[in-house]
Amino acid sequence: MRVDLFDFELPSENIALRPARPRDSARLLGVGRDGPFRDLIVRDLPDLLNPGDVLVFNDTRVIPAQLEGQRGEARVGATLHKRIDLRRWQAFVRNAKRLREGDVIQFGAGVTATAEMRLPDGSWTLFFPGEEPVEVLLERAGRMPLPPYIAGKRPTDEQDREDYQTMFAAKDGAVAAPTAALHFTPSLMEALAARGVATETLTLHVGAGTFLPVKADDTQDHQMHAEWGTIDAATADRLNAARAAGKRVIAVGTTSLRLLESATGEDRVIRPFEGDTSIFITPGYTFRAIDGLMTNFHLPKSTLFMLVSALMGLDRMQAAYAHAIAGGYRFYSYGDSSLLLP
């Protein structure tokens, strides 16, 4: 499909620079396969779900993966986006034209890294010497890696260390938040439990590649980025049992959805999974694992807008986004959300 079919105009005032407070007061657009759109708030979610429905959350934790440093006299910026091993990370490096293999970058706070290898996609392998885990070094020297559409409009601050982390965050490794889950609060979780809604968690370490633009003119020519994820056997078994009992599995966020679909065969059985996934979902895809999706509003011509269009239909999603824009919904990572139930 032509990528420009997934384009739309978004006024800059619709881009959220801070999250709603409290988190579950954000707006929620209810979208079915047909019929009118429903203007709700996230706190309404328990009334929209049935007892026995299962919400699936991503428990990855965002690390402060953005570093600013010096290579000699030159300033260098790095965004770590994929762990290679205990001391090596793959990173997008800014101002890297003169960076050479073996160069040492001083990131401050006693943190240094050696540029080991330039990779075919233009990123670099960085080696962090010493005994401390790299995650500890990042807590000392790094900043939260806010998406470019936020970071380009205001500086990152300490508040983002809290705001850009979900209540489920448990496993270090993401460089972008699974943003649909940012809307959940302990009180909302209590209300969902009282409604009889079940919850499960999986782990997908969201990479910076999630923000890379689609440069191809046709979707079939786009190379999707890979991200590491895992679903354990017990979780897979419970999800399969819920579906066998006629209950709905609803992914909270596109990261949860992509990992669930990666772990599910043509027989619609969810299996344990551990490894990289580069699944790219576009219209025409047959969903095997999920019955619905809660997700924020995505960028024009992005792989994630293609994903929601695959779930609900392109015309339906273009209409939903037009409704959201006209209604003043807030877009992107810190913005409002939608509940898509085909």
From Swiss-Prot:
Keyword rRNA-binding included in the entry's annotation: no
SUPFAM superfamilies listed in its UniProt record: QueA-like
Alphabetically ordered keywords of this record: Cytoplasm, Queuosine biosynthesis, S-adenosyl-L-methionine, Transferase
Main localization category: cytoplasm
EC number: 2.4.99.17
Cellular localisation: Cytoplasm
GO CC annotation terms, alphabetical: cytoplasm
Role description: Transfers and isomerizes the ribose moiety from AdoMet to the 7-aminomethyl group of 7-deazaguanine (preQ1-tRNA) to give epoxyqueuosine (oQ-tRNA).
Organism domain of life: Bacteria
Catalytic activity: 7-aminomethyl-7-carbaguanosine(34) in tRNA + S-adenosyl-L-methionine = epoxyqueuosine(34) in tRNA + adenine + L-methionine + 2 H(+)
Keyword Metal-binding included in the entry's annotation: no
Protein name: S-adenosylmethionine:tRNA ribosyltransferase-isomerase
GO process terms (BP): queuosine biosynthetic process; tRNA wobble guanine modification
InterPro entries (UniProt xref): QueA, QueA_dom1, QueA_dom2, QueA_sf
GO molecular function, one term: S-adenosylmethionine:tRNA ribosyltransferase-isomerase activity
Pathways per UniProt: tRNA modification; tRNA-queuosine biosynthesis
Annotated family: Belongs to the QueA family.
Enzyme class: transferase
Subunit and interaction comment: Monomer.
